[in-house]
């Protein structure tokens, strides 16, 4: 997920999201402890970028540092593309992106409700398999499970 606040771009990882009914709405879990969430709540804009399998290690590493301290686009060599409906950038290395606006926030549950306003697809991307977080430091890339727990040990809650 990418955000932008007065030209300062950031990208964060999200491990849980879901489509909602038959509207272009998406529910996503995050909260005010997160730098990107605070930016998103201020600007009311996000881009959901859809990474593919070869980006998985980069995605995991993005989730281990804060955009308050690191320019993640520079640190992880990501290329920004301008969005059409929102200020947050698209990520050129991704397969697709959804430009979104915030329509609701359920604070008690850290649940952000987004509405997609535009979809972008990268037709030049050869890799089409997308990444899915399992929730314990392991990931699936369209059926293949890949274990990156060692990179996430500090971020995982006790007992996971």
Predicted features along the sequence, with ranges:
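Basic, polyanion-binding surface patches
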Residues: 1-160
């Amino acid at each position: 997920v990418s955000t932008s606040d007065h030209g300062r771009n950031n990208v964060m990882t999200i491990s849980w999201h879901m489509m909602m009914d038959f509207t272009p709405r998406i529910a996503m879990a995050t909260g005010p402890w997160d730098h990107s969430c605070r930016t998103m709540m201020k600007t009311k804009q996000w881009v959901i970028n859809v990474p593919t399998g070869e980006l998985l290690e980069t995605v995991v590493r993005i989730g281990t540092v804060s955009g308050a301290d690191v320019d993640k686009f520079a640190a992880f060599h990501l290329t920004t593309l301008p969005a059409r409906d929102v200020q947050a950038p698209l990520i050129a290395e991704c397969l697709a992106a959804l430009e979104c606006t915030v329509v609701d926030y359920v604070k008690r549950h850290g649940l952000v409700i987004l509405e997609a306003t535009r979809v972008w697809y990268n037709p030049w991307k050869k890799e089409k398999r997308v990444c899915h977080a399992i929730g314990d430091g392991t990931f699936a890339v369209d059926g293949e499970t890949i274990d990156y727990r060692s990179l996430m040990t500090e971020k995982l809650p006790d007992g996971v």
